[in-house]
Amino acid sequence: DPFDSRLDDELERARLRRVFSQGLDHAVGYLLPLQATGHEGARWSSGPWFFRDERMYLVPGDSPMGYRLPLDSLPWVSPAEYPHTLAQDPFAPARDLPHAAVLRAQYASHARFTRYDPHTAGHGFAEGGTVSLQTAEPARFASAHWITRTGLCVEVRDPARANGPEVEMGEHTHSGVLYVFMPPLSHLDDYLDLLAAVEATAEELGVQIVLEGYGPPRDARLKLLQVTPDPGVIEVNIHPAHDWPEVVEHTEFLYQAAFESRLSAEKFMTDGRHTGTGGGNHVVLGGATPADSPFLRKPELLASLVLYWHNHPSLSYLFSGLFIGPTSQAPRVDEARNDQIYELEIALREIQRNRQIHGQDMPPWLVDRTLRNILIDVTGNTHRSEFCIDKLYSPDSSTGRLGLLELRAFEMPPHERMSIVQQLLLRALVARFWIEPYSAPATRWGTELHDRFMMHHWVRQDFDDVLTELGDSGFHFDPAWFAPHFEFRFPKVGEVQVDGMTLTLRNALEPWHVMGEEGAIGGTVRYVDSSLERIEVQVSGINPSRHSVTVNGQSLPLQPTGVAGIWVASVRYKAWNPPSALHPSIGVHAPLTFDIVDTWMKRSLGGCQYHVAHPGGRNYDTFPVNAYEAESRRLARFFRMGHTPGRMAGVQPTLGVPASREFPFTLDLR
């Protein structure tokens, strides 16, 4: 934008200084017009580019040269004859790729020979080479469809400019690096052929190069490892694994490589809580090729996974991150709309009906269109869903027809073995439903979803059912394998014992909601209300007709767990008071004082206190340096004392405490 130079930004000032200092007569780089022909004989075509002033001026900026080519200044071509670069159909048959030695031998110094004929025009080929030269000049008002409109760009840049203006303008050695901009191509064979030519040229000249531009076309024959910087994390997309040992090898290598790079898959919050990085540990399932995808070959497998995840909320919440709920990155099906389960049941019946009609020849697009408008979030986004089918079989583009299912309700665990056992669980569930599809009725959880299943006890009970069902199907899992996941997801805050009664506190889950739009500089923003937190309270050994547990003087609606003498409930409270919150007039409820009250004697037998911040008023402004400091910060916020002294009248025993109709397992201090 020429009217918004953003001179306040140091990086923008450095960019403008760099652009204006080089001048208009400075040669940025070199362009070789190049295009794959797509037929036998000469594999490549080239030719001159025609400009009115016989000079090629790039679009202003400092991006790579290939992104700034003045393609609109080339001779006119009719829309019907424009040479679009189209992606190949992923279901098209493909032959084996040539060996690397064959490609290198093709471009050896003794094998390269291209003859240029100045009279060659149109689609004529030069003899003895692999490149056809097209030199015909376009006539007036004629469509110049033969002109090559893609090219290989080569330029020299100083890589130090990527480290900021201080390094760029500092006293460092200004050394240029040769950057080769790869053009867009449709076939992987052409990309590898061009890459072999670039490699042979660089090797003969003895120069080091950096590839940039367009990546290779998506192809099942190519293993692709992508590393992308994201805010706060580095996203790594690993190439597919074909068997279980390869899955273990990939996961262990990823964690080890991150450790050697001084990166970690965990972090500690300011208050010392151990959490994930916030980045996803998304699992992508599919086949070696799109045609081999188990979800397209057997659509009831996908239906079984969706229905099973719905009936077992522990699979949605045990491995997710802190941000859960209808506006999170991976909401459940029943968190989108109230009638979504009703529509899901209709969609699953349609899959079953079409399967009976078409049998093994069921069109794959039916699976996509049946579930595309079901697996969405509250805004209709198909990507922000627990089960993302954007790359299953979307007819919109070839990159959407890959037969892949992405499970997004997984956060990066802190240890590689925690990630490995997650993937082992998924493999077992896929194998189970491949043999015997899941056909149980869908459960209407209602408000139980954000009530019961926010607590450690009920998530563990539901997950134990999952492991039991897998064991009955021949897939035996030791529950101890998932003990680190429960301790990581529901960390223990503290425990106190009074007269044979035990009171245990654990962090529980809390769905955060997105607030309404608010005005901000340059537009509008929508804040996330993270001011609410939840604590699970588990008590054992009490007499429910005599004892009661209170939080800041309010009786807790303890519920039986099915185990004699153990009662559980959760406390929802406002931990801090941000400028934008759901109820801004409600103050902070911390510290929380828990009392085990003897209603017969009308006094507190004992209890504990939990502080959200340091009880001495210390305000930490840095993150913990290691796990030991984080643990000390957590322990400093829990006290096995501080219960309410004196007489406590009017407290009802556990059996007489009224519970909320919407959230019977939760005491909301608001």
Show which residues each predicted segment covers.
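C-terminal accessory/tail domains of diverse enzymes
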Residues: 1-209, 215-232, 239-277, 288-670
